[in-house]
Amino acid sequence: MSTGLVNAREKEYLHLHRIDKHKCSHSSATSSPSSAASSESSRTRQRRSDGEVYGSRHNNYKSSSQHRRRSRSGSDSPQVRHYSGRTSRDRQRMRQARDHPQASRCIGVFGLNTNTTQQKVRELFNKFGPIERIQMVIDAHTHRSRGFCFIYFENLGDARVAKDACTGMEVDGRRIRVDYSITQRAHTPTPGVYMGRPSRPLGRRSRERDYSTRDTSRSRRRHRDESSSVSPYDSNRRKYRSRHRYDRSRSRTRSYSRSRSPRKPVRVQSRY
């Protein structure tokens, strides 16, 4: 009887021990997803905080860079557009001044014959009033008239009368046009072909240097024009010729190296 009670108690103890182990494993299994979820949420919060910090830094950098650009330029885009509009107005004002110049003591005579001299111009305009000076525009290379000149009268009224009376007059077979000068200051010689008469006559060496420089510039310009207008056929022929020349030079070098290569010594066996 006592042995049966002992066996029953052992079975009950083993059963209870199995139940406890099952509960412990179940509790650990249920607690692991919650811990994983909590760690994932903590990592998400960390990422969000890092993103907010990066975003704030990026916004601060953008604002500072925009501020630096504005401080360097000193103006925003509307002011730039205002500046461009002001430039267009200035161009329009200059165009109007060129088309309708103001009355001045200096008048320009255009369309003259290149053979018309300064003395001939003075004889034509001297009858309208005293002339301060006459400036003939001379070509620096040919030393001939460019076909127009500027006349400076002492009085504004005399210049106005000469302009109205001489516009359309025929001088040396050419019909001239007379108009007020745009600039009020004296006309200075300009660089290039359109220049005034030099202050001292050019020597022989300076003229030869001038002509040689001009011929060199012309030949360079002609060479650039010819090189820019090469047809595809000519370019292909040039490529073929250069390639053929390169192949021939390589073959010559190879044959020369072969002929210069050292020969192997021939052994002669003695019969004795």
Swiss-Prot record:
Entry protein name: Transformer-2 sex-determining protein
Keyword Phosphoprotein: yes
Region of interest (Disordered), residue spans: 21-102, 182-272
Location of the region described as Linker in the Swiss-Prot/TrEMBL record: 184-204
Gene of this entry: tra2
Name of a matching Pfam family: RRM_1
SMART domains assigned: RRM
Protein family per UniProt: Belongs to the splicing factor SR family.
Entry superkingdom: Eukaryota
Source organism per UniProt: Drosophila virilis
Skewed-composition ranges (Basic and acidic residues): 87-102, 205-218
Residues covered by the RRM domain: 105-183
Post-translational modification, as annotated: Extensively phosphorylated on serine residues in the RS domain.
